[in-house]
């Protein structure tokens, strides 16, 4: 019999800021809901390995949606009549995430996002701390300047290939070629101007340098950044984490797209974090918990009683 992945895909209609979006999402697993956010210009396929991971799915209901205009989520009706170029804004992005979670009736989900999906975790902590139980910010920091540039959407440049090749260097040279080129392929398929429009949020509309100290610490935030990432360097992440209450900063040997460029290494890094989340919320773990028992050792142990940021470097 042919192999099937356990992933199930559906569409849900989300209304946000006066428009309705037919939004595609995939999910698998049971337990604590965990909504995953893809990077700028890509889509939810970046999380296909985590969606299929039996250890994760035994304890987490992992859900990945395509942001409108990405992947299988179409632009809103009438998009071709829009006079202004597409720009993802902080307000829309944050509100859409919240509306998506409410549409699926998720109770205090975990949010895990990378790149722009990681940066938005800071906004969610500032504005919607009561909506979430934990935030996992991959390749994230309080400001990522310099990426909103015109060549990313230019009539004389092949957008897909230019965008995909531009981000290729953000991956670790140690990541398997198979997965690096798979990540390249995702980017080559983006809609015209979408990557640049996402980077408006990433580089222009998401400057949290004077805001992160206001995060209360009510929701734990886990920062994880690869040492080969030069869009969000380890130093940028560590500087941010130092200002965020109840945070932990983990630096590991990876690149800007950890979930897709090297899923095996990412699993080694994310497993202790997910175990901590389970330990802090045991009532919502899934039914099959043999592999991730809270009695088994995990790197770092439990969260300290104080809310000071912590830093760990994992040499993988």
Describe each region flagged by the PLM.
Residues 17-18, 63-112, 268:
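Active-site loop/oxyanion-hole signature of alpha/beta-hydrolase fold enzymes
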Residues 17, 21-79:
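Conserved HGGG/HGGXW glycine-rich cap/lid loop of the alpha/beta-hydrolase fold
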Residues 200-242, 253, 259:
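Conserved serine/cysteine hydrolase catalytic core
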Residues 146, 159-217:
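Conserved alpha/beta-hydrolase catalytic His-Asp/Glu region
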Residues 119-163:
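Flexible "cap/lid" loop of the alpha/beta hydrolase fold
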Residues 2-22:
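N-terminal cap/lid segment of alpha/beta-hydrolase-fold proteins
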């Amino acid at each position: 019999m042919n192999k099937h992945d356990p992933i199930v895909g559906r569409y849900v209609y989300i209304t946000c800021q006066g428009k309705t979006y037919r939004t595609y999402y995939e999910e698998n697993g049971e337990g604590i809901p965990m909504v995953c956010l893809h990077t700028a210009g890509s889509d939810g396929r970046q999380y296909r390995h985590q969606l299929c991971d039996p250890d994760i799915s035994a304890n987490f209901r992992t859900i990945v949606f395509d942001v409108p205009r990405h992947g299988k989520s179409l632009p809103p009706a009438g998009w071709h009549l829009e006079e202004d170029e597409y720009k993802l804004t902080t307000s829309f992005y944050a509100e859409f995430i919240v509306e998506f979670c409410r549409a699926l009736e998720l109770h205090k989900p975990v949010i895990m996002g990378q790149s722009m999906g990681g940066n938005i975790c800071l906004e969610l902590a500032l504005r919607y701390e009561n909506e979430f139980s934990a935030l996992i910010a991959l390749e994230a920091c309080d400001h990522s300047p310099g990426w909103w540039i015109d060549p990313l959407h230019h009539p004389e440049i092949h957008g897909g290939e230019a965008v995909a090749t531009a981000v290729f260097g953000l991956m670790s040279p140690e990541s398997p070629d198979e997965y690096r080129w798979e990540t390249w392929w995702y980017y080559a398929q983006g809609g015209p101007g979408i990557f640049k429009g996402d980077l408006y949020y990433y580089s222009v509309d998401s400057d949290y340098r004077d805001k992160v100290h206001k995060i209360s610490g009510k929701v734990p935030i886990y920062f994880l950044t690869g040492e080969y990432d030069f869009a969000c360097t380890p130093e940028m992440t560590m500087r941010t984490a130092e200002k965020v209450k109840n945070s932990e900063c983990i630096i590991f040997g990876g690149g800007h797209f950890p979930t897709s460029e090297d899923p095996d290494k990412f699993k080694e890094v994310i497993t202790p974090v997910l175990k901590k989340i389970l330990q802090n919320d045991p009532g919502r773990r899934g039914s099959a918990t043999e592999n991730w028992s809270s009695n088994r050792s995990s790197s770092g142990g439990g969260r300290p009683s104080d809310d000071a940021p912590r830093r760990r470097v994992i040499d993988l």
